[in-house]
């Protein structure tokens, strides 16, 4: 494992998803899933999210579209919050989901719009 890249990834992960969310995920690490968490931090968040060629806002926008298409509701919730943290507006999220509708199908968009509204409501309630 590249410890420097792992640490960089962990820092980015906390900045995007929130320190509380990441710390909660890490407190559930055991010998079975530790290698996966290391991979997640080093490769996903360090090696890819840590690249300079795309800003975090753009990466978040891409993630919303891809995760919507893959029908991963838990991850969509997490990344919608991260996208807002990275400066993606609610209007931009709506437009991403409109694009999902025409290229990936209405069922994917219906679920994603519902999840986005739930996330917005949760945030608005504090």
Q: What does each model-found stretch correspond to?
A:
Residues 1-57, 85, 110-126:
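Acidic, glycine/proline-rich low-complexity segments that act as flexible tails and inter-domain linkers
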Residues 8, 12, 44, 61, ...:
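A general alpha-helix detector
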Residues 31-32, 68-69, 86, 99-106:
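A short structural micro-motif
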Residues 36-38, 72-79, 100-115:
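Short amphipathic alpha-helical segments at helix boundaries and their inter-helical linkers
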Residues 40-44, 61-68, 96-101, 112:
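Short alpha-helical scaffolding segments that buttress acidic/His motifs in well-ordered protein cores
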Residues 61-94:
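Mid-chain, well-packed structural core segment of small domains
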Residues 91-95, 108-111:
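Residues forming well-ordered secondary-structure scaffolds
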């Amino acid at each position: 494992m590249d410890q420097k890249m792992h640490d960089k990834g962990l820092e980015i992960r906390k900045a995007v998803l929130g320190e509380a969310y990441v710390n909660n995920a890490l407190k559930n690490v055991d010998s079975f899933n530790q290698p996966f968490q290391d991979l997640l931090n080093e490769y996903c968040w360090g090696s890819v999210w840590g690249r300079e060629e795309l800003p975090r806002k753009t990466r978040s926008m891409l993630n919303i579209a891809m995760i919507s298409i893959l029908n991963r509701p838990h991850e969509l919730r997490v990344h919608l919050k991260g996208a807002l943290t990275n400066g993606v507006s609610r209007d931009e999220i709506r437009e991403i989901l409109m694009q999902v509708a025409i290229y990936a199908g209405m069922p994917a968009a219906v679920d994603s719009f519902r999840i986005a509204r739930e996330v917005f409501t949760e945030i608005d309630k504090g």
